[in-house]
């Protein structure tokens, strides 16, 4: 999956909307960015907003907030719109103003719009961190479940990190693969000003463990005293991850 990082919100241009793309939003102005982008996609547009949050086991529980069309009081999602043959009569409701993201949830806007061809855009609002210790991202499941806000916040942000560095094992990637089965998206643009570490540093526990074991094996020698120091340091590091 190709990834681009934009450090300044104003760098997003209409040209960024000419191919199927995911925007991963870690900005202080996510709602403004979404409203600005969607205004460029009118008038032929179909959208669906989802909200998702992890349960105590880390499983993402997802529901639809709104969409362009309803049938029998049930929101139609983008895949259903495509399966129905892209009926323009279903492009009834224009996208709502972007929802604000709580610290324990993530909002996804799935958009299909037409300008010479159908193009699909995903806009993912990532919650801001409510923690200060970045090491929590390595294994969120060590955290207590009550109160739930911290566990959910760290878990969601670790899933976002996983989407960029080890997507096939990220629950967020699995969710997006379920949401998007046609008009496949292979490019992610990350938009942030103050959250670069989440999208530039890999926090995968498996990779940390592999690195630690490789380091440990490379340090062991015939020196018994030094080996004891290495073992103690290894145990200390292992306890933290």
UniProtKB/Swiss-Prot annotation:
Q: What is this protein called?
A: Core protein D3 homolog
Q: Which InterPro entries match?
A: Poxvirus_D3
Functional note: Late protein which is part of a large complex required for early virion morphogenesis. This complex participates in the formation of virosomes and the incorporation of virosomal contents into nascent immature virions.
Q: Which UniProt keywords apply?
A: Late protein, Virion
- Entry's induction text: Expressed in the late phase of the viral replicative cycle.
Q: Which residues form the signal peptide?
A: none
Question: Tell me, what's a Pfam family for it?
Answer: Pox_D3
- Places the protein is found: Virion
Which GO cellular component terms, listed alphabetically, does the Swiss-Prot or TrEMBL entry include? virion component
Family membership, please give it.
Belongs to the chordopoxvirinae D3 family.
């Amino acid at each position: 999956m190709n990834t681009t990082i934009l450090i300044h919100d104003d760098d997003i241009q209409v040209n960024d909307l000419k191919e199927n793309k995911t925007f991963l939003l870690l900005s202080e102005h996510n709602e403004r960015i979404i409203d600005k982008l969607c205004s460029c996609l009118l008038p032929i547009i179909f959208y669906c907003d989802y909200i998702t949050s992890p349960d105590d086991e880390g499983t993402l529980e997802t529901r639809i907030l709104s969409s362009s069309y309803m049938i029998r009081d049930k929101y139609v999602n983008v895949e259903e719109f495509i399966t129905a043959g892209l009926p323009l009569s279903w492009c009834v409701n224009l996208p709502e103003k972007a929802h604000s993201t709580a610290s324990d949830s993530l909002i996804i806007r799935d958009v299909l719009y037409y300008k010479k061809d159908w193009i699909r855009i995903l806009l993912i609002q990532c919650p801001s961190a409510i923690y200060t210790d970045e090491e929590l991202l390595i294994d969120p499941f060590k955290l207590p479940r009550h109160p739930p806000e911290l566990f959910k916040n760290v878990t969601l942000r670790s899933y976002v990190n996983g989407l960029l560095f080890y997507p096939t094992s990220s629950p967020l990637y699995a969710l997006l693969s379920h949401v998007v089965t046609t008009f496949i998206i292979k490019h992610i643009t990350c938009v942030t000003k103050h959250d670069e570490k989440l999208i530039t540093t890999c926090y995968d526990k498996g990779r940390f463990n592999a690195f630690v074991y490789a380091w440990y094996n490379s340090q062991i020698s015939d020196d018994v005293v030094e080996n004891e120091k290495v073992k103690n340091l290894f145990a200390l590091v292992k306890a933290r991850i």
